[in-house]
Amino acid sequence: MGKRKAKAKVKPKRRAPPLDTTFTCLFCNHEKSVSCSLDKQSGVGNLHCKICGQSHQCLITALSAPIDVYSDWIDACDAVANQAKEVDNINDQEAYSPEAAYEEEKE
C-alpha cells in the first residue's frame, strides 16, 4: 500500500485595503484636506476642502463610493477648464479675423 497524497494548504485571501475618504485638493494642492461624505438616503455626495473651502456636490447611487464623488469633481473641473479654453479661442478668432482686418484696410 502506498502513502496518501498530501493536500496543499489553502492560502487565506488577502483583504483589499479600505478606500480613502480624504483626498488631495485640486485648487490648493494640500494632501488629505478634502473630506467626502455620502448621504445615500437623499442620493447626494459632498466634498469639502478644509484649507481653501472649495466644495462640490453631486448625485450618487447606492453603489457609489467616496472616490466616485472625487472623480466626478475632477471631471467637472476639467469640463470647466475646457469650456474656458473654447471661449478664449473663439474670442481670439473674432478679434483677429482676416475679414475684419480687410474691412478696416478698405476704410
From Swiss-Prot:
The keyword Methyltransferase does not apply. Keywords: Metal-binding, Nucleus, Phosphoprotein, Transcription, Transcription regulation, Zinc, Zinc-finger. The keyword Metal-binding applies. InterPro entries: Elf1 (IPR007808), T_Elf1_sf (IPR038567). It is found in: Nucleus. Zn(2+) binds at residues 25, 28, 49, 52. Pfam families: Zn_ribbon_Elf1. GO terms for biological process: transcription elongation by RNA polymerase II; transcription-coupled nucleotide-excision repair. Gene3D superfamilies: 2.20.25.190. It comes from the Eukaryota. The modification Phosphoserine is found at residue 97. GO terms for molecular function: RNA polymerase II complex binding; transcription elongation factor activity; zinc ion binding. Its main location: nucleus. GO terms for cellular component: nucleus; transcription elongation factor complex. Transcription elongation factor implicated in the maintenance of proper chromatin structure in actively transcribed regions. PANTHER family: TRANSCRIPTION ELONGATION FACTOR 1 HOMOLOG. This is Transcription elongation factor 1 homolog. The lineage of its organism: Eukaryota, Fungi, Dikarya, Ascomycota, Taphrinomycotina.
